Every structure is written in structure tokens, then in C-alpha cells.
Amino acid sequence: MKMNAKFISSYDDYQKCPEITKPEYAFIGRSNVGKSSLINSLTGVKNLAMTSSKPGKTQLINLFTIEETWILADLPGYGFAKASQSSRIKWGRMVHDYLKNRTNLTTVFLLVDSRHEPMKSDLEQITWLASNGIPFSLIFTKIDKQSLTQTNKILASWTKVLSENWEELPKMFLTSSESGKGTEELLTYIDEINKQIAN
């Protein structure tokens, strides 16, 4: 289903982002995790978020208004090895400043590649979000690239690792940008949160 999705603008500092009262959902993940493809699949708008075979394409905070009811924030990926250290530090600071200070931020969706065991950089992001009291959910991408058995194996690994530090696990979604699997569940979840906020 094609949604009414419009690009607002790109920003290199959260303080430059417009003050918006609508609930905002941030999407973040390692470079090349399939974030842009998922955003396009989620909204049904093919080129809403620019995709690239080269990691590190997203370098700014990109805001979109969705159905005129909520805001989608496409954040720079982390773990891009070819970026200079100064660039990685700059992106990291920009993203963390946004996540800590954006007043209408409702939930962070942390995207992880379903083909990989828990990675240090992903776990560091999760720990940072939790320690700063920022609500987040996990989105496992590219489940179409492997068997259900392998996906479940990776999911079990994540559950085990997270259970070692947290009693309550974050909500998890299994998605495929190719087939669209998981996008309906994700949109339903966002809609439920929006209704709770409205009430």
C-alpha cells in the first residue's frame, strides 16, 4: 500500500530540525543493513529513502512526514569502515544528540541483519539506548536471504544475549524489504502507539 509520505528536509544538527508535535520514529542501524530499502517498503514509496549499494550513503538526519500523522527519521548508519574516524565521531555525536534531545521522539527502531550473530556495535547501541532511557525495538532485516531455520537460530542467539542483561526484552520484528513481510506488523505497532499518545 502506498502511503502519503513526504520528505521534509535533511539536517546536520538536531537543533536545526523543525519543532514538531507529531510522534517521531527513528530508524537506525549499521551501514548496509537495508534501512533505506525497509523505509521504502514500509511506506510503499519506491524512492522515498535513497538506497545505495555503497554503505554510508545516509550522512544526515532525514525527516519525512507519513500520512500527516507521524514523522519518520532516517538516521546515519554506524560501523562504516571506509569513513574517516573524524566523520564517524561527527555522525555518532550528531545521532546521539538527536536521540537524547528530540522532544517528540517516540521510539527508536534499531535495524540488525538477520543473517548475523549479535555484533558488538549493535549491542553497544542497545546498551546506550537503554542507559539513556530511550524506548527502542529491534527490526531484523533481510530474512528472505536465508531459511526460516537459520533466522530462528539467529533470533535465539539475540534472545540469549539480551536476556543476560535485561529481564524485559525489546519488541522484535522480522522483515523483508523484498517480500514486504513484517511491514504490516510494524505499521500496526506504530499505529497503536500513535493512538495511545492521542488518548
UniProtKB/Swiss-Prot annotation:
The keyword Disulfide bond does not apply. Residues 21-196 form the EngB-type G domain. Keywords: Cell cycle, Cell division, GTP-binding, Magnesium, Metal-binding, Nucleotide-binding, Septation. GO terms for biological process: division septum assembly. GO terms for molecular function: GTP binding; metal ion binding. Mg(2+) binds at S36, T58. Its cofactor is Mg(2+). The keyword Cell cycle applies. GTP binds at residues 29-36, 56-60, 74-77, 141-144, 175-177. Gene3D superfamilies: P-loop containing nucleotide triphosphate hydrolases. Necessary for normal cell division and for the maintenance of normal septation. Belongs to the TRAFAC class TrmE-Era-EngA-EngB-Septin-like GTPase superfamily. EngB GTPase family. NCBIfam families: GTPase_YsxC. This is Probable GTP-binding protein EngB. It comes from Cytophaga hutchinsonii (strain ATCC 33406 / DSM 1761 / CIP 103989 / NBRC 15051 / NCIMB 9469 / D465). The gene is engB.
